[in-house]
Amino acid sequence: MYAVIYDNKVLVGPMNWNRGMFQGALERKGIQYPLPRTAPNNLPLTINEHAKIMRVDEIRPQMNPLVEFYYGPLWDITEEAAIANYEVHDSPIESMRYNLKQVAAQARYNKEVLGTTATIQDQEVTIDTNRGARDIFVQKYLLMADSDLVNWKFPETWLTLTKQDLSLAVQAGAQYIQNCFDWELNISEQIDQAETKEQLLAITIVE
């Protein structure tokens, strides 16, 4: 990372080497100086008594992006480099809540599509709960007559299902998915009730 420095103040940067941006910054100060296409090995590059291009060293403390953000950079210009210091500040409480609700929604979706089990014809079978698979269960159930039979392949075995058998799979999947959404609602209510960063971070979302 690099920065254009003018009278010990940063004009442009920190950024990757960008000859066009750097020359533009110099020209706005009335300085014409042909810069190389790629970053020079020897830095700082002194342009004149006012301007130079320096390597940037960033100092970023550990930060939790769900509830905090970086403030800065606050510059410290040394002989060798421009030091970009960042401070960690708390995000507004509404931003914290929004971010944690996004985490909860993703966690709910991950649970939602994991699948569940049901006992059909005295056998425990896995019910696929991803959104495509559960639509197939429901559509087939709606199309079946009461007397129809259907051969169904579960991960564990093949079963010949009656409409009543298939309803057990549909009900198991629907109840499992509802439980996932109820879990997310509970987490969302806890988030809304929290008033501080510490209270928000005490909520267990992902185990």
Report the location of each language-model feature.
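A preference for well-ordered globular domain cores
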Residues: 1, 5-207
